[in-house]
Amino acid sequence: MSVAKVTEIITSSTKSFDDAILLGIARSHKTLTNLKSAWIKDQQIMLGDDGQIQEYRVTLKITFVIED
């Protein structure tokens, strides 16, 4: 029997939502083992004073299996 755990992270990129997702998964992989899935819970853009997009933020729920 395996047991899974879900952790929520917020990640960002100045390039795109896709880049923010990839950065978040890569960073999670550094500290968590047995990553199984990711759910994109939320997406948000941060705007500068000029109205231009400065940052893409993504909230992810990462599922990983806990080792015995």
PLM region spans:
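A cross-kingdom feature marking charged/low-complexity
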Residues: Q44-D68
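Short, well-ordered alpha-helical segments
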Residues: S2-K36
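Amphipathic, hydrophobic secondary-structure cores in small proteins
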Residues: K36-W39, I45
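Soluble periplasmic/extracytoplasmic beta-strand elements of cell-envelope proteins
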Residues: E8, W39, T59-K61
